[in-house]
Amino acid sequence: MFSHVTIGSNDVGKAKPFYDALLQPLGLVRHMDYPNAVGYGPADGRPQLWILNPIDKQAASVGNGITIGLEAPDRSAVDAAYKAALAAGGKDEGAPGLRAHYHPNYYGAYLRDLDGNKICVVCHRKP
């Protein structure tokens, strides 16, 4: 559905290690790396998630009501990504667990990145 998603950061240099840690358990790698932007995607693909300083040179700000949902291949990847993100400085917004009010197999975790952007890591598959 989406070509790409961008997440604004006020310090891309600090954001890179955070997103490296978060995305590695999901099988996503850096495809492009610039001083003010970094692009991630599947190893055999192209960058689809960009972390960057806003193009308009204004400060990055958090969108109220916005969550970026990243799909994990299995529940252990949700757990690993959540743990890695917290170890890299992320803030807990909901530990990994089943959230059957979304659907019976929704296993997800919620956190905030170093700039305060809300991220969800979720697996929709049966265990």
Model-predicted regions and their roles:
Residues I7-L49:
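Core segments of cupin and vicinal oxygen chelate
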Residues H4, H31, T67, Y82:
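Histidine-centered active-site/metal-ligand motif
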Residues S9-K14, L70-A109, L114:
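Vicinal oxygen chelate
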Residues L22-P35, D56-Q58, R75-S76, A88, ...:
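Long, contiguous binding/interaction regions
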Residues V29, A37-Y40, S61, G69-E71, ...:
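A structural feature recognizing the 12-helix transmembrane core of secondary solute carriers
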Residues M1-K16, I68, H124-P127:
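N-terminal beta-strand motif that seeds the catalytic metal site of vicinal oxygen chelate
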Residues G41-A80:
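Long, continuous compositionally biased terminal/linker segments
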Residues P42, Q48-W50, G108-L111, C120:
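A short beta-strand motif that forms the metal-chelation/ATP-contact edge
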